[in-house]
């Protein structure tokens, strides 16, 4: 394969994703001639980076972040004419998508197990113009989860989402 874009959310999970940047890049270099890394800084960055990867015909996108980051990436490629392969490393608080896909929840283990030679198709959903890869909910629960700050997620992990 020719090129891959790594999309890393540095505020996901325990804010430790950047600690694995070099290891991810080295793993990707075993499979790809060109490895480009993008670091998100604000909402919609992952969507914009994924759209760029699709527009520029990247062979694959690897997202390292939580469910929100993965959903942003899915939104960035879902309606494009060309859709690159998608790999996910669990770096968030809940990592529900990677759990459903039975991806190793240990970051080092997930990186070690990355295999770009095989793919699986997954279903995605869309509501009000927003794509999602795992769960759709309405009402006070998603609002409460959305309002949990990065600091609380870092400090309390999944317990911060208990409301």
Predicted segments — roles?
Residues 68-84:
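Short Gly/Thr/Asp-enriched flexible loops that form oxyanion-binding sites at enzyme active sites
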Residues 1-61, 71, 75:
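ATP/NTP phosphate-donor binding region
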Residues 10, 64-66, 89-91:
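Glycine-rich beta-strand-to-loop/alpha-helix junction loops that act as flexible
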Residues 43, 68, 113:
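Positions that flank functional sites
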Residues 42, 65-66, 137:
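Helix N-cap/beta->alpha junction signal
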